[in-house]
């Protein structure tokens, strides 16, 4: 169940309120076994009115301890390369497919994605971004509803209903592979070019 199941932007409440409501429903979630080993639920963070939403895989150790996505080494990398797209962390919204850390940072299991994905879909519906950047295979597979690998999907934009989707490498993987880091940076420059060519309506009139 991916982004294509979102029929339209139907939230009547302000986006900030809608996100608070989703987080309240999430509460002390025990819909899968990950609650047994987590320290914190990592809901998401950022600008509720962001044009660009980043979706990663799952919290890592630092994220689990601090309760915020992308705060470890991968987060530092993400913060740095956001500037290549003309963005700052406070401009975007960041979330993960899973809200709890899988033990040993293993890949999400299908039953975990099934349990957690309704919360992500509601976050997407509330924020209603123009662009979704999927970081790594699990997020890309969820959003684009495909099993094709990230190396074949990155480097271009994909239209999924209202949303423009840009798949790219997860910063954690790119930190282990200099060639992927270069491609990740290329993708962020491409994102910046796209944003310049497609300004937000309020920007276009300036």
Language-model-derived ranges and their functions:
Residues 2-206:
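A polyanion-binding, active-site-adjacent surface
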């Amino acid at each position: 169940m991916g982004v294509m199941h979102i029929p339209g932007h139907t939230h009547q409440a302000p986006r900030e309120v809608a996100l608070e409501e989703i987080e309240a429903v999430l509460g002390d979630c025990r819909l899968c076994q990950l609650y047994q080993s987590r320290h914190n639920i990592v809901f998401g963070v950022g600008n509720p009115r962001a044009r660009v939403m980043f979706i990663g895989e799952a919290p890592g150790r630092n994220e689990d301890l601090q309760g915020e996505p992308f705060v470890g080494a991968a987060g530092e990398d993400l913060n740095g390369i956001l500037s290549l797209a003309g963005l700052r962390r406070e401009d975007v919204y960041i979330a993960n497919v899973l809200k709890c850390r899988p033990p040993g940072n293993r890949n999400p299991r299908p039953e975990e994605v099934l349990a957690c994905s309704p919360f992500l879909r509601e976050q997407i519906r509330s924020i209603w971004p123009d662009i979704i950047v999927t970081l790594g295979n699990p997020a890309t597979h969820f959003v684009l509803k495909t099993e094709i690998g990230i190396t074949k999907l990155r480097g271009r934009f994909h239209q999924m209903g209202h949303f423009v989707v840009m798949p790219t490498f997860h910063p954690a993987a790119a930190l282990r592979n200099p060639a992927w880091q270069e491609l990740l940076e290329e993708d962020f420059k491409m994102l910046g070019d796209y944003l310049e060519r497609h300004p937000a309506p309020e920007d276009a009139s300036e």
